Amino acid sequence: MSQFTHINASGEANMVDVSAKAETVREARAEAFVQMSAETLELIVSGSHHKGDVFATARIAGIQAAKKTWDLIPLCHPLLLTKVEVQLEAIESENKVRIESVCKLAGKTGVEMEALTAASVAALTIYDMCKAVQKDIVIENVRLLEKTGGKSGHFKVES
């Protein structure tokens, strides 16, 4: 079994030293779902939500969040991201929104946390913008879908 990388021999949490690692191109994809009523989803899809374009706001929030991951998650490194993409898709047959984020860089540490943060904050932004019309919205199934690069290599969720 793999060991925790952020815990030292004394059991204390520390930021991992990546100074000796080689720079490689690294990319990660994550997703999140936001479950809501058909009426709330229709407000978003039709563009008639009183707060404006929910998807555009959530997309920008996700991008901003990816860039601030190091400031939100205590042991994450500040990274020079070269790409952050957040896509939102209404799945009207299931009354939900699917969010997929992609983060990329050439660096010494991975971007999984940045991709997960982007998807999570985009989902939280949808909740924030819609809570006035529906309070029981559910954010669910936030997960890493795929990552490439680095020592641990390629990981992809089994469908």
Curated annotation (Swiss-Prot):
GO MF entry, a single one: cyclic pyranopterin monophosphate synthase activity
The pathway is: Cofactor biosynthesis; molybdopterin biosynthesis
- The first-level EC class reads lyase
Alphabetically sorted, this entry's keywords are:
Lyase, Molybdenum cofactor biosynthesis
Q: What is its EC number?
A: 4.6.1.17
Active-site residues are 128
Q: Which residues bind substrate?
A: 75-77, 113-114
Q: Which GO terms describe its biological process?
A: Mo-molybdopterin cofactor biosynthetic process
Q: Name one Pfam family in it.
A: MoaC
The domain of life for this entry's organism is Bacteria
Reaction equations catalysed: (8S)-3',8-cyclo-7,8-dihydroguanosine 5'-triphosphate = cyclic pyranopterin phosphate + diphosphate
NCBIfam families, sorted: moaC, PRK09364.1
User: What's the family?
Assistant: Belongs to the MoaC family.
* Quaternary structure note: Homohexamer; trimer of dimers.
| Biological function | Catalyzes the conversion of (8S)-3',8-cyclo-7,8-dihydroguanosine 5'-triphosphate to cyclic pyranopterin monophosphate (cPMP).
Q: Identify this protein by name.
A: Cyclic pyranopterin monophosphate synthase
| Taxonomic source organism | Vibrio atlanticus (strain LGP32)
